[in-house]
Structures are given as C-alpha cells and as structure tokens.
C-alpha cells in the first residue's frame, strides 16, 4: 500500500485536525494462542472491537503489543501492523493509525519507513534505551520525522523510559513534523515540562495526549495556563484503553467541557484504582500486559493471557484486584457491550 493510501486518509493536515479534535486511542494488544503464535482471528476481533467502541485511533506495535514482536525469531511486527491497517480500511471511517518506533537510529528508521509504506499516519517514538545527550536524541528525532510524522513519547523510567529535560522538549517542539506528544512520565512536574514546552513554542498544531495512567481524568479535565496560553490534553493514548474502550469514549466526552465536578472527581479515583489493578502497580507493573489480557479473556475476546515471554503473567493477588475494581464500577466496564457483538467480531 502506498504512503498516500493511509487508512486514515487526507494527509498531514487532516491528521493534525483529527488529533486535535480529541481521540480515544487504545494501545493494541497482541492475541496469541496457547502455543504463543499469532491468533489472527482474535487479533482482528480486537481491532473490530476498538473501532465499534468509537476509538478515534489505534496504536500498534507499542509496549502493549509487546516489543518482542520485533525479534526476528518472532517475526510479528509487520503482520500485526498489516492486520490493523486492513481492519481500519474495512471500517471505512477516519481513524488515526499510529505505529510504534523504537531502537537505535538504524532500526527506528527502518520501522518508520515500514509504517510509511503500510500507510500509517504517524510513528510513536520511544526513546527508551537511548543513552545520548539531548543533542543526540534530537538528531535522532529529526531524522525520523523526515520519514513519517512523529508522536513524541515521554515514557516513565519505571518501565524503561528516561528523564527528559524541559529544554529537550522545547527543542523537540520545533521539529516541523511533530504532530502530537504522548505524555506519560507518571510525574506531575515532568508533565508540566512538556506542557510548558508546547506553550512556549507558540505552536497550535501539536496535540497533547495523556499516557499518565495514574492521572488519566485529571489530565483530560485539566486546564493549563502558561504565560497567557491555555492548553488542554486533547485525548489519551493508553494501554488502559485497550479494555473498556466504549466506556473510555464516554469518559472523554464528559471531560471535554473542562472542569472537575464532584462526579468526575469520584470517577477519576475509580479509573486510577482500576488502572492499578490492570497494570499491577503493586508489583511495579510486572503484570501490566497480562492484566489487560485477563480482562479481555474474561470477556471472550482473547482465549488466554499468554505473552511472548513465558515468564509474563498475573502477579499474586492481581486477579482478585481485577475482580474487585470491576465489581465496584461496572458502569466503567464494557462487559455487556462486548457480549452483544463479540461473536460477530470473531467471525467477521
């Protein structure tokens, strides 16, 4: 598929408008069978679920998809990108299709070129593992932005990210082909570094997306004022939204008017509590992927919680925590929605 044949259509300007409009963008999991091979039927069913739930974008080949798909012995990076793109084209509506980019510059450039060739709209650029200084990182980012539009990614150090200075983000905002930033340092001070950098850049064509799983609603309902400029997070690009996506769409709609009323404040705490269970915060996120798989397994979208790494699974007590949070807030869950259409998604 040519780069001009993006599943989302209408080029860079349309992508910027779409991202700024505010989207729920789930990070796409990987569906495996008991032999830890790709389960194409269930992989497609997941994509169909997200699109039916009202997601405005998809992030594929990212942490939730498992970085090991890039291992030549696994060989799943291109196949999972292709499956998602095919389902988006079948859906026939405007969706922001974002693929993960990681690794040293040579690897990252090859991944960016693949995204471009498959018609992806943008690359989510992980800087995890890079040890260079700000100048080295910025050169890396500029080179990739010449290949594909870039979504910056501030990843928390606890899961492989690194601290990045306000000065880095201020310079990053000057890269013309930056279309958005996923802000996920799990740190209010560092979150403000990114917001300030965007405000001071003067740009109004870069969207802020939260990845702060510990403060999703606070980010989405918040209003930031920096030297006379007011900014908001447009939406979220979240592994958390790989489950209960329809409920996430409704939640984002409630956050759009701005301001945290009492009901939204209560729900903000509930969402964080749910995230702690799914992402296994009690064990430093060891079971974060398996926790999402467990929810999808219970709903019948996945056959099991298998990960490429056989050592990955639920932590002790994590299943009970998932029971607790879903029992407490069924209104924030998609169980009925999934049950009504699951068989169609699996057979379509």
Which residues fall in each region the model found?
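Active-site beta->alpha loop and helix N-cap motifs at the rims of alpha/beta catalytic domains
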Residues: 2-169, 336-337
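Repeat-unit-sized solenoid/scaffold elements
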Residues: 122-142, 187, 191-194, 221-223, ...
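C-terminal alpha-helical cap/extension of soluble enzyme domains
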Residues: 3-15, 25-29, 53-54, 230-348
């Amino acid at each position: 598929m040519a780069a001009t044949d993006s599943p989302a259509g209408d080029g860079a300007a349309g992508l910027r408008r779409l991202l700024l409009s505010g989207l729920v963008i789930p990070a796409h999991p990987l569906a495996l069978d008991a032999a830890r091979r790709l389960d194409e039927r269930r992989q497609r069913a997941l994509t169909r679920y997200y699109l039916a739930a009202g997601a405005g974008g998809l992030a594929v080949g990212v942490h939730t998809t498992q970085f090991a798909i890039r291992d030549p012995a696994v060989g799943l990076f291109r196949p999972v990108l292709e499956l998602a793109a095919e389902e988006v084209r079948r859906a026939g509506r405007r969706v922001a299709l974002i693929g993960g980019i990681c690794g040293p510059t040579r690897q990252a450039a090859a991944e960016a070129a693949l995204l471009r060739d498959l018609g992806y709209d943008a690359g989510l650029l992980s800087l995890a593992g890079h040890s260079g200084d700000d100048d080295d990182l910025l050169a890396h980012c500029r080179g990739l932005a010449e290949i594909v539009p870039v979504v910056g990614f501030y990843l928390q150090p606890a899961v492989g990210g690194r601290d990045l200075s306000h000065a880095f983000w201020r310079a990053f905002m000057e890269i013309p082909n930056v279309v958005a930033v996923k802000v996920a340092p799990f740190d209010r001070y560092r979150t403000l570094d990114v917001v300030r950098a965007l405000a001071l850049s003067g740009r109004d064509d870069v969207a802020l997306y939260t990845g702060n799983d510990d403060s999703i609603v606070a980010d989405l309902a918040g209003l930031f004022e920096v030297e006379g400029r007011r900014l908001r997070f447009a939406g979220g690009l979240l592994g958390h939204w790989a489950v209960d996506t329809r409920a996430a769409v409704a939640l984002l709609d409630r956050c759009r008017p701005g301001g945290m009323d009492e009901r939204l404040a209560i729900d903000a705490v509930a969402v964080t509590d749910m995230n702690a269970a799914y992402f296994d915060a009690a064990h430093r996120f060891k079971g974060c992927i398996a926790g999402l798989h467990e929810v999808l397994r219970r709903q019948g979208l996945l056959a099991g919680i298998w990960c490429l790494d056989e050592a990955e699974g639920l932590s002790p007590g994590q299943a009970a925590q998932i029971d607790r949070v879903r029992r407490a807030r069924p209104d924030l869950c998609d169980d009925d929605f999934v049950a009504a259409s699951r068989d169609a998604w699996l057979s379509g």
